[in-house]
Amino acid sequence: MKVQDLHLDYHLVEDILKAFLFNELRKFGFSSVVLGLSGGIDSAVVCELAVRALGRQNVLGLMMPYASSSMESLEHAELMIKKLGIQAEEMPITPVVDAFFSSVPENQLLRRGNIMARTRMILLYDVSARDGRLVTGTSNKTELLLGYGTLFGDMASAINPIGDLYKTQVRGLARHLAIPEPLIVKAPSADLWEGQSDEDDLGFSYEAVDLLLYMMLEKRMDKHAILGQGIEEPFYDRVRKMVVRNQYKRMMPVIAKLSGRTPGIDFRYARDWQEVR
């Protein structure tokens, strides 16, 4: 099995995701969105889809750099802003983040990264409240399955059009959407500290893990069959452990059931049935 097996009909994917954005916004009673523009491929793809679905006047991009953020990230975010002609604001997070960092040791990179991600989430939701825009997420399927993201940080949003696309599929969609090539070919990075890269953090490439996840989820192959495809056992075991261990990140908070009608369990009226007022 090869990574090419993950290829999709990206014309169809585009149509489905544009309809998703348009219809979900209507159901929620919104007409515009706000999203973080990091300069990476995921936010670029979501921004492009939002403009095609809603019109550029209904899309606001926030650039939220920290002092150590790379200039390349800002340049690539601005490249998308100019390409699409959307509204954009730059809101540096350095003053807020540094107030937290004063009590977090420099070698605690995970804690510091989480603080940065959650600070950006606060800004996105504040702009949502200010302007009446729906916060749109940019986490891809690979990140969500592996738990490679910050709970109530970059994983927080009201809707997410690319959450069922593996990273390699996001790249394929990006080429279909004519996203600028520099954003597609650069090494993926959350840009949480200088020199940080996703694949260095994870210890494997997106191509390798996407193929493994595809076999585990979409093909529903067991361990024996997957190892028969040339996947090394330690790699399989590590990825499976990450998927299982991070299930809590893919769920709403679990509620202890005490009554006959519990929110999120058996009190679940579909919002589609309700008239938006």
Swiss-Prot record:
It catalyses: deamido-NAD(+) + NH4(+) + ATP = AMP + diphosphate + NAD(+) + H(+). GO terms for molecular function: ATP binding; glutaminase activity; metal ion binding; NAD+ synthase (glutamine-hydrolyzing) activity; NAD+ synthase activity. InterPro entries: NAD/GMP_synthase (IPR022310), NAD_synthase (IPR003694), NH(3)-dep_NAD(+)_synth (IPR022926), Rossmann-like_a/b/a_fold (IPR014729). Pfam families: NAD_synthase. Pathway: Cofactor biosynthesis; NAD(+) biosynthesis; NAD(+) from deamido-NAD(+) (ammonia route): step 1/1. GO terms for cellular component: cytoplasm. Its EC number is 6.3.1.5. It comes from the Bacteria. Mg(2+) binds at residues 42, 143. Gene3D superfamilies: HUPs. Keywords: ATP-binding, Ligase, Magnesium, Metal-binding, NAD, Nucleotide-binding. SUPFAM superfamilies: Adenine nucleotide alpha hydrolases-like (SSF52402). Deamido-NAD(+) binds at residue 118. ATP binds at residues 36-43, 138, 167, 189. One of its GO terms (biological process) is NAD biosynthetic process. Belongs to the NAD synthetase family. Homodimer. Catalyzes the ATP-dependent amidation of deamido-NAD to form NAD. Uses ammonia as a nitrogen source. This is NH(3)-dependent NAD(+) synthetase. It comes from Pelodictyon phaeoclathratiforme (strain DSM 5477 / BU-1).
